[in-house]
A protein has these predicted regions:
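Sec-dependent bacterial lipoprotein signal peptides
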Residues: 1-19
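Extracytoplasmic metal-acquisition and chelation regions
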Residues: 6, 20-338
């Protein structure tokens, strides 16, 4: 009897043990299945996120800026709604630029294109419009940012012919016009994001307005006899005319004859007649002609350069249009108030 009971107990124990093992195996299989399912979900989520990011990039307006200052304003107003491709890099003449294959592709695919005008990019027969025509771009997408600016002219020393001065953007008030016109163009092309462009433009325009007022105050405080800016090229005409300055330079129109003996002689005569206190050299020109003027006139070149055609590379001291305007007023005020 006792043996029978022992056998029954052993049998029951064995059944229970086998049942427990079966449950553990089922749980492990379920866990493994859940893990595989979750891993699959994670892979799908990663794939979806990548696709979404690609879609977001694809949704951005593809924008062309012809040179560094315009491209910087595009970034300020367009923000994360745009992808900008700058054509003329820092250190390159925007008048005679030769587009690269990448430039041509970007122009072909662009949603909107901004250029300065006033012949900075070579005019209607210049490199920019040849590229537009070659790409088959719709000219309704192409916007000049100087439509509201009255052109000023320079006389070529050799030919005595008048040419438009394209350096409008050195004047902060022209910067305001450019930003306003760019905002309006973005809204015309992308009306769904009107509020976004309005908000960013308003903030940027407030900063430009404050800079304009700073120019009025600080340049106004400079003694009248010092209100003469002498530079290598006559690029500062629009800004100086607005704030009541006289301009003199070595060459008026950029040619291969820059810094000729006759040009240097005429500028030295002007310096002596007007008791010019300081000379300036632009950041992107050959300093030797002005060094000759300084040596022969006895007037020093200011220790810091002044900016005209471009902003610096990212990370440099003057790598945005706002910094460019602030830098120039600091240099002029420091040099001419002494």
């Amino acid at each position: 009897m006792r043996n029978t009971v022992k056998v029954m107990i052993l049998a029951i124990f064995t059944v229970l043990l086998l049942a427990a093992c079966g449950n553990d195996n089922n749980n492990n299989e379920a866990t493994n299945n859940n893990t595989e399912t979750n891993n699959g979900d994670n892979e799908n989520n990663t794939s979806d996120n990548t696709a979404n990011q690609s879609d977001e990039d694809g949704d951005k307006l593809q924008v062309i800026g012809t040179f560094t200052i315009i491209s910087d304003i595009v970034r300020e107003i367009g923000g994360d709604k745009v992808e900008v491709h700058n054509l003329v890099p820092t250190g390159t003449d925007p008048h005679e630029y030769e587009p690269l294959p990448e430039d041509n592709k970007k122009v072909t695919d662009a949603d909107i294109l901004f250029y300065n005008g006033m012949n900075l990019e070579g005019g209607e027969d210049g490199w920019f419009f040849r590229m537009i025509d070659s790409a088959g771009q719709d000219e309704d997408k192409v916007y000049s940012l100087t439509e509201r600016v009255d052109p000023m002219y320079l006389t070529d020393d050799e030919t005595q012919e008048e040419e438009i001065n394209p350096h409008t953007f050195i004047d902060p008030m022209v910067g305001i016009y450019m930003a306003e016109d760019m905002r309006d163009a973005f809204i015309e092309i992308d009306p769904d994001n009107e509020a976004y462009y309005e908000e960013r433009a308003d903030e940027y325009l407030d900063r430009l307005q404050a800079i304009h007022e700073d120019y009025e105050k600080r340049l106004g405080d400079i003694p009248e006899e010092n209100k003469i800016l002498v530079t290598s090229e006559c690029a500062f005409q629009y800004m100086l005319d607005r704030y009541g300055f006289e301009e003199a330079c070595i060459w008026k129109v950029d040619t291969e004859e820059n810094g000729s003996p006759q040009q240097i002689k005429e500028l030295i005569s002007f310096i002596e007649d007007n008791n010019v206190p300081t000379l300036f050299v632009e950041s992107n020109v050959d300093t030797r002609p002005m060094e000759t003027v300084s040596a022969e006139s006895g007037v020093d070149i200011y220790e810091k350069p002044i900016y005209s055609d471009e902003i610096g590379e990212p990370g440099e001291e003057v790598d945005t249009y706002i910094k460019y305007l602030n830098y120039n007023i600091d240099v002029m005020s420091e040099a001419l108030s002494e």
